[in-house]
């Protein structure tokens, strides 16, 4: 993997440094064994490994950016999906690629088309495409609503993948009955929920997703776990009830279809 330039890194990190992005970057780094760049939040020392923590009194390292493979294909993809030309150019490797980038044919892409492509990247297990969508999420051209939908999809996918996503894909490929798949689906999400109960205190951005999983299992202790207001609890419960009613208790062909259905109906 090739490093982004220092200038590009600082530009992206300064604009988009937040907890949600940090957790996504961290899991992307684990998932694809990318090099990662850490920065000490106290002395601003930068190191390409986490060994900096041994050299500094401040142990609170902030994961700045996963180093993404840059090429013209990624650049053109970002551009065709609606990223600004300035943002897309950050992923060109050299001047020649920048010159080859035709910014005159930038098509307006609907939210539904972007989410459809994102879903296909899940189903095809296309790692570079998924990373590209994450980068697209950082582009400032998109509406807040679409940004949140994309973020929800990616968080969902990555955590599921860390749990037992590959196992699910094996079952899915064997054409098990819908009822069997549903049992497997619940088993996966129960493991996911137990992990989220621990993670949500560290990453508050996952709270809504934790509600979703908790109420799916009718776990009333979710209220105590997250110390939330009554209004927050009621809002989430109502959304889950609506989702269960609309999808027949979420009898979906796969976890991917399930998450895509949420994003398409603007529940989050």
UniProtKB/Swiss-Prot annotation:
It comes from the Viruses. The chain crosses the membrane at residues 176-193. Induction: Expressed in the early phase of the viral replicative cycle. Residues 1-175 are cytoplasmic. Keywords: Early protein, Glycoprotein, Host membrane, Membrane, Transmembrane, Transmembrane helix. Glycans are attached at residue 227. Its main location: host cell. Residues 194-268 are extracellular. It is found in: Host membrane. It is a single-pass membrane protein. GO terms for cellular component: host cell membrane; membrane. Belongs to the asfivirus MGF 300 family. Plays a role in virus cell tropism, and may be required for efficient virus replication in macrophages. This is Protein MGF 300-1L. It comes from African swine fever virus (strain Badajoz 1971 Vero-adapted).
């Amino acid at each position: 993997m090739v490093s982004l330039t220092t200038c590009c890194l600082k530009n992206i990190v300064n604009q988009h440094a937040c907890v949600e992005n940090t957790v996504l970057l961290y899991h992307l780094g684990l998932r694809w064994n990318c090099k990662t760049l850490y920065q000490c939040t106290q002395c601003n020392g930068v190191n390409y490994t986490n060994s900096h923590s041994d050299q500094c009194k401040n142990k609170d390292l902030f994961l700045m950016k996963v180093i993404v493979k840059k090429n013209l294909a990624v650049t053109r993809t970002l551009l065709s999906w609606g990223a600004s030309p300035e943002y897309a150019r950050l992923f060109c490797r050299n001047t020649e690629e920048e010159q080859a980038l035709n910014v005159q044919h930038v098509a307006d892409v609907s939210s539904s088309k972007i989410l459809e492509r994102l879903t296909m990247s899940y189903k095809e297990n296309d790692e570079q495409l998924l990373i590209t969508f994450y980068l697209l999420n950082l582009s400032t051209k998109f509406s807040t609503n679409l940004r949140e939908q994309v973020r929800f999809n990616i968080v969902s996918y990555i955590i599921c993948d860390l749990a037992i996503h590959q196992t699910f894909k094996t079952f899915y490929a064997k054409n098990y009955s819908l009822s069997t798949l549903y049992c497997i689906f619940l088993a996966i999400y129960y493991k996911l929920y137990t992990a989220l109960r621990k993670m949500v205190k560290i990453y508050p951005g996952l709270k809504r997703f934790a509600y979703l999983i908790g109420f799916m299992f009718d776990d009333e202790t979710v209220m105590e776990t997250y110390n939330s207001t009554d209004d927050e609890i009621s809002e989430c419960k109502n959304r889950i009830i609506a989702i269960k009613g609309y999808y027949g208790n979420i009898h979906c062909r796969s976890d991917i279809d399930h998450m895509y259905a949420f994003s398409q109906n603007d529940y989050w």
